[in-house]
Every structure is written in C-alpha cells, then in structure tokens.
Amino acid sequence: GIKDVDIRPATLAPELITDLLKGQLGFNGLVVTDASHMIGMFGATVPRSEQVPGAIAAGCDMFLFFNDREEDFGYMMEGYKNGTITEERLNDALHRILGLKAALNLHIHKKEGTLMPPKEGLSVVGCPGHHQIAAQIADQYVTLVKDRENYLPMTPEKYKRIKLVFIGGEGRVIAGQLLKGNDEAIKADVIHQLEEAGFEVDAEEPVLKGKMEEFKKRFDAVLLILSVEGFAQYNVMRVKWNLPIKQPWYMSEVPTIVASLTYPNMLIDVPMARCYANAYMNHPEAVHALIEKLMGRSEFKGAYNDNVFCGRWETRF
C-alpha cells in the first residue's frame, strides 16, 4: 500500500489514473489535469517543477492552464529530458490527444474552416427569447420559506415606504485575477423594479442608525436583500454586516422581509427573520419574479428542503 504521507491528489496519482482508471477499468479516452491553479491539486504536495511533468507521468494526457508559460513549459521539457516522462508515456498521451481530435473530426473542420462558429452566432446572447425563458423559469423556482407573522403580501397600500437594505458579495478571482462584482447594478435594478411597482424606496446607507422611533415613523417595512456571492477562493460564504444600518436590529421594529438572491442557506445568518424567501439568482428576471410573488401578484411555486434551515432549530421560527 501507499503510506499516508505519500498520498497525492488524483492528478498526480498514478495508482488512480494509470493503474485503476486506464488499467483495471479499461478507460481508453483522454485524461486532462485539474486546473493547475487549483490549490487542492498543486498547493501543498511537491514543488511545481515536479508537479508539472509528474501529472503527465502519472497518466494525465493534457495539462490545463499555465502559471507562467515559459517556466511551466521548461518544467515539462526538463521532466521529459530527465526521464520523469518516459518515451512510452509521451507517445501514449500523443496518441490519445490525436485520437480525441479525430473522434471530434477536428481535422475535417480545420480543412473546411469551420473549427470556430461565425461571430454572428454571438447575437443570440441576451436575445429577447432567452430573457423570456429566464422569466418563465424564475416564475417556477422562487421559493417562500416562511412568513410567520403574515407580512405578505408586500403591497404599496400596506408598505408604501420601503427601507431597502442591500448586502452584496465579494470580488471574484477568475483565472488568477480579482474581478469586481456587479452589486451596484443589481441594487439599482432592485430599486428600479420596486419603484415601478409603486413603492417609495430609501436605499441610503448612513453611518449612524439614528433613533428607533424616527425609523419607525419614516418606514413601513424593511426589505433586506442578500446578494452574497463569491467564486472558489472562499471556503464559506456568509453575510457580512459591514455597516450598523445594515445589521438586523430593525427586525423587531418594523415588518422585515428577507430575500436571498444567491445562496439558499442564508438563514444561518438571519435566523430572526420572520419572513424569508429564496430567489437563487440575481438577474432582472429573478428579481422581477421575486417582487411579483412578494406582492401577491403571482404565487410562490418553488419548493425547499430542510437544508434551508441549516440544521438549526432557531431558523425555523
């Protein structure tokens, strides 16, 4: 057997790729490494100079993504020169690569000039038909989890003056680059759709909360929107109350309706919410479906399971 200290991620494990997958299971296709930026694959095992050729030696046939093109290519060449990648292993990988290309008729497409579809095909992205489909699907999945105090329906007649509290997410790291999120656009869309529905919306974020009694006189209800999202670089995504005005002190002062536009398990951070819904997505069609259902213009058709309560008794109340 293998000692625990010698266990490697699958991409670097010949006992899995070569012995089990290609040997015992008879897999005759192409094996591509995990993305070489992934910490689970390359973070804490052996130096990258050994990882790069080691992945091919272990049985992978293609290597996905560079850290540095020149350096990684040098690591691969050195692995071939020093025998880490044998001639037999190299030829096997090449045969599998060529075999996949042939199976996909890439040589024919190249000859015919049809490897890439025409740019005109991009015109369908964001077309009216796709937005219509998005709206139809959103109508089916927006879910009401609880409304213990019967705050709904949320109508202008009942709650004309809405205090909007918007909690956004973090920037995203994609292909090694930090990209800014689109929280401001999502927030602006929520405000626009609420105003179109007849509400007066206050989305200001003052430094101080101010007096409770004044808050209750100014607003009929609070709509707390959670659009918390990230990408891969975080192990856990939680609500971050970055300003006092956003912290959920208002839930016992005025009717507060909470809706998550992303993760469905946000009750772990707002267990005190009496009314909570999941919209799952933060695009305009999902926001529209959410508002329509909160207002009682459309029924909630989505379903939830016990995971939304995060295994905690207090989230159910």
Regions inferred by a protein language model and the residue ranges of each:
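Catalytic metal-binding/acid-base residues of hydrolase active sites
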Residues: 36-37, 262
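Short beta-strands and strand-loop turn motifs
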Residues: 1-2, 32-36, 225
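Preference for extracellular/luminal or secreted protein segments
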Residues: 13-14, 23-24, 43-317
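Short, solvent-exposed loop/turn segments at secondary-structure junctions
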Residues: 1-2, 39-40, 231-233
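Acidic/histidine-rich helix-loop elements
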Residues: 4-9, 37-46
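Active-site-proximal beta-alpha loop/turn segments in soluble metabolic enzymes
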Residues: 1-8, 118-124
